[in-house]
Amino acid sequence: MIDIRYAKISDKEFWFSLDGHLPEDEYENITRLRRGYILLQDGQPEGLLRYNLFWDSIPFCTLLYISEACRGRGYGKRLMAHWEREMKARGSGILLTSTRA
């Protein structure tokens, strides 16, 4: 079963096992502002998404990462769709992303 929830302080070790870009002191902001999500497969964390606000108002996805063992199963697509629905429900009419291959 797949579940997606907000990141918590207790997810910090998992978070940094996948996210090598976020300064460690920023993690508390991600959790406090609810700008990070954890994807769980059968209760085990396997992916994450974080975002910031561009121009202080436009949601901008700054990282989407799925553990290597779970890639190719559509989990990234599900995580992105979850974020898009939530941002739309909050009134955002535009979202931004950036990719690196």
Model-derived features: positions:
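Acetyl-CoA-dependent GNAT
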Residues: 2, 6-62, 67-68, 86
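Generic N-terminal initiation segments characterized by hydrophobic and/or small/turn-forming residues
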Residues: 15, 45, 77, 92-93
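Short, structured secondary-structure boundary patches
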Residues: 49, 72-74, 101
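Conserved acetyl-CoA pyrophosphate-binding loop and the N-cap/start of the following alpha-helix
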Residues: 70, 74-82
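Conserved GNAT acetyl-CoA-binding A-motif
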Residues: 87-100
